[in-house]
A protein has these predicted regions:
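Positively charged n-region of N-terminal signal peptides that target proteins for export
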Residues: 1-4
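N-terminal signal peptide c-region/cleavage motif recognized by signal peptidases
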Residues: 13-17
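Short, non-transmembrane alpha-helical segments in secretory-pathway proteins
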Residues: 20-48
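Structured segments of extracytoplasmic/periplasmic soluble domains
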Residues: 36, 40-44, 71-72, 107-110
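N-terminal glycine/threonine-rich, aromatic-flanked beta-hairpin/loop signature
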Residues: 45, 62, 68-70, 132-142
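Surface-exposed patches in mature extracellular/periplasmic domains of secreted proteins
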Residues: 48-56, 114-116
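Mature extracytoplasmic domains of secretory-pathway proteins
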Residues: 55-106
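Short beta-strand edge/turn micro-motifs at domain boundaries
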Residues: 98-134, 140
Length: 142
């Protein structure tokens, strides 16, 4: 009996394995993550941008977002006039619209964008860093 109680105590002390959390509209963390991503996207697409969230999930100190950028009031972004095309010379045929995928990591001080891509023409995040983002990408190859 004593061995069983020790086993139960050990199991209870282990961290629970939780599923990723979908952040609902209006959640403070959702706003914080989108505001962390916004300056990077505005550098590439021009300001201002708003995000339409397809998916935004958090798993502990990691997060993964799939969003589409638009102008205020829902106006579409003309990719031809964006800094990533005009300033950086990115060919339009290599950009599949203002869709963004982004990975985040929470440090002691704040959330940071680890990696993001705008207008990917492939599923670049397939199996991306499964060691750290596996729970967030379980349906995407991890």
């Amino acid at each position: 009996m004593r061995s069983f109680l020790v086993f139960v105590a050990i199991i209870c002390a282990l961290p629970a394995s939780a599923d990723p959390v979908d952040l609902p509209r209006g959640a403070a963390l959702r706003g914080e993550l989108l505001d962390t991503l916004r300056p990077l996207v505005e550098y590439d697409l021009g300001a201002p941008v708003q995000f339409v969230v397809t998916s935004l999930q958090v798993d502990g100190d990691r997060a993964f977002a799939r969003v589409t950028a638009q102008r205020p009031m829902g106006a579409p972004i003309d990719m031809n006039t964006t800094p990533m095309v005009q300033r950086d010379g990115l060919p339009l045929d290599t950009i599949d619209g203002p869709r963004i995928e982004a990975f985040f990591h929470q440090t002691v001080a704040r959330w940071e964008v680890v990696e993001y891509v705008i207008g990917a023409t492939n599923v670049w995040w397939w199996g991306y860093d499964c060691k750290h983002y596996g729970a967030l990408l379980s349906e995407w190859g991890c």
